[in-house]
Regions:
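N-terminal organellar transit peptides
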Residues: 1-88, 92-198
Length: 198
């Protein structure tokens, strides 16, 4: 039997500051060294990523996605609830991705809290961050850069916001996720990929 490492990405992806104790979080500073160890050991042959996240910090979420994408071992992700916001790059960062029929993905423009300086440079900075996300997602899935940007700036779905919610099959049709499936499908796919790599 193959030895699989299980990684859960849940709640909110924590940034460079601790969130409140009542918030369920994924701490990137724990996961990055964990993934480095997984890459460096012969005992682990594949990684299964379970995702149910509302999103969170952009730079930390992208760091996790880049780390997953750069692993040499087979990786499979399974969206079992939500994969919102920066959860989208995480879901597509693996070699193959699944979403359960009721799972959702929310694609929306970059948001920032706190005090902002109202200059063109601030807008350009937002555009740069957004481009990093669009480039990563389109580079690791079947959706084009332009189509993803269109989904991100959709004004017809959310009453007080921009963006698109994709449920299950819609995420597959748009090319974000590879296939509809559950834990059995995800594990079987990972075992098959490991077997082909041996």
């Amino acid at each position: 039997k193959s030895k699989i490492h299980l990684l859960s990405i849940i709640g909110e992806i924590e940034g460079h500051e601790n969130l409140s104790g009542s918030t369920k979080t994924t701490k990137y500073e724990h996961i990055l060294p964990e993934l480095a160890k997984v890459e460096d050991t012969d005992e682990i042959e594949g990684i299964l990523v379970l995702i149910n996240t509302v999103g969170g910090d952009v730079s930390c979420g992208l760091a996790l996605a880049e780390m997953l994408a750069s692993l040499s071992k087979p990786t499979v992700s399974l969206v079992i609830g939500d994969s919102h916001s920066i959860g989208v790059p995480l879901a597509v960062s693996t070699d193959y991705s699944f979403i359960v029929p009721s799972g959702t993905m929310l694609v929306h423009p970059v948001r920032m809290s706190g005090m902002l300086i109202g200059t063109s440079k601030t807008y350009e900075y937002f555009e740069m961050i957004q481009d990093r996300i669009l480039s990563f997602v389109s580079g690791h899935s079947r959706v084009s850069y332009d189509r993803l940007k269109e989904l991100m700036h959709n004004t017809k779905m959310l009453s007080k916001d921009l963006g698109t919610v994709l449920v299950g099959e819609n995420a597959v049709e748009e090319g974000l996720i590879d296939e509809i499936g559950g834990i059995q499908d995800a594990l079987q796919k990972l075992y098959d990929m490991i077997e082909r790599k041996r």
